[in-house]
């Protein structure tokens, strides 16, 4: 069987590279001898790093050829079908689905979050996904939206495949040893309202430092995340560190070792849950809020971008409460991790059914 994977691959975003790592590993486990082709921004690197075939994602002739050669086309995982990023991005990913369906390939929306979508976005998804054979989504909001748009497609709830990532060996970065514990990891990204939140995030970081935590910023989205991290560090009275992160093992290992994670990045929060680490979310996107709802997480956000003035709590107080409750929260998060791992396997169970058709 020959698979083609369409996602945000080859851009150096470690969250998406983790996603690809898990999907490729599970496909090899379930389909020995399968050929895996990945649409990538940097196909040579993707082919080398994951031992797969890779096709340049913006070479439309090559993409069309890759679709025609595939037996099964997987759109995902990730938040691909949304036009908060841009309509161009949505048209690209929806166009892959449309082309695959028209070419008679078995086509599946795989482990995605759907939306936000405006009117044009909804029409685009509705038209491009007619004839889709299978779909799994990461949260209830996405399931409801996609079922409304597609009607005749059974949309199944799952969870992000990164919940299935393996426990890493203990990671030491730049000579950091046990003296860095207790560790708090912060993963931020620039958002539309980011400038409004730098002081708020800094206040939370400073309170954690006062309580004895060692805070490190981990830019898993690359240079843009490092820039966002630096902007917050400059607003801090304490002295958090900015750590370079050049591979998924480093990111996974540090988050698994942390006592608390502060996350804008969805995959930072997913990794925290996977390894039973309490967290404070910064819900810049509905998919972050949906994840917290799905696990019944009891803590409010550290800061909510775009919230009405006066409707937010005190970030420093939120940080203090999370730190003092961290042991009890770790138990709750660990139990949620077991449920989410079962849900994440559902992506591959639905794929198995499609492969047998």
List each model region and its residues:
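Active-site anion-handling motifs in enzyme catalytic cores
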Residues: 1-357
């Amino acid at each position: 069987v020959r698979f083609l994977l369409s996602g945000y691959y080859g851009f150096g975003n470690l969250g998406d590279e983790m996603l690809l790592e898990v999907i490729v590993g599970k496909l090899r486990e379930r389909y020995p001898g399968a050929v895996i082709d990945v649409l990538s921004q940097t196909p040579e690197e993707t082919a080398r790093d994951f031992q797969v075939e890779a096709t340049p994602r913006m070479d439309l002739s090559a993409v069309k050829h890759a679709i025609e050669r595939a037996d099964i086309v997987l759109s995902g995982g990730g938040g691909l079908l949304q036009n908060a990023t841009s309509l161009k991005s949505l048209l690209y990913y929806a166009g892959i689905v449309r082309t695959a369906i028209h070419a008679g390939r078995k086509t599946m929306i795989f482990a995605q979050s759907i939306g936000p979508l405006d009117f044009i976005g909804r029409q685009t998804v509705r038209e491009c996904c007619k004839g889709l054979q299978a779909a799994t989504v990461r949260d209830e909001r996405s399931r409801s939206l996609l079922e409304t748009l597609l009607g005749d497609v059974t949309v199944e709830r799952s969870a992000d495949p990164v919940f299935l990532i393996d426990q890493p060996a203990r990671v030491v970065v730049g000579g950091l040893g046990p003296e860095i514990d207790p560790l708090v990891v912060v993963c931020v990204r620039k958002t539309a309202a980011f400038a409004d939140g730098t002081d708020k995030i800094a206040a939370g970081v400073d309170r954690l430092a006062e309580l004895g935590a060692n805070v490190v910023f981990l830019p898993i989205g690359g240079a843009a995340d490092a820039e966002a991290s630096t902007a917050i560090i400059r607003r801090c009275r304490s002295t958090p560190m900015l750590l370079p992160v050049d591979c998924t093992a480093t990111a996974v290992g540090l988050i698994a070792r942390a006592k608390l994670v502060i996350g804008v990045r969805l995959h930072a929060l997913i990794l925290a849950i996977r390894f039973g680490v309490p967290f404070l979310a910064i819900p810049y996107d509905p998919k972050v809020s949906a994840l917290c709802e799905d696990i019944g997480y009891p803590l409010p956000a550290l800061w909510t971008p775009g919230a009405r003035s006066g409707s937010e709590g005190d970030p420093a107080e939120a940080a203090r409460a999370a730190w003092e409750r961290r042991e009890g929260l770790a138990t709750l998060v660990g139990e949620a991790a077991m449920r989410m791992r079962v849900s994440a396997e559902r992506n591959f169970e639905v794929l198995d059914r499609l492969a047998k058709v």
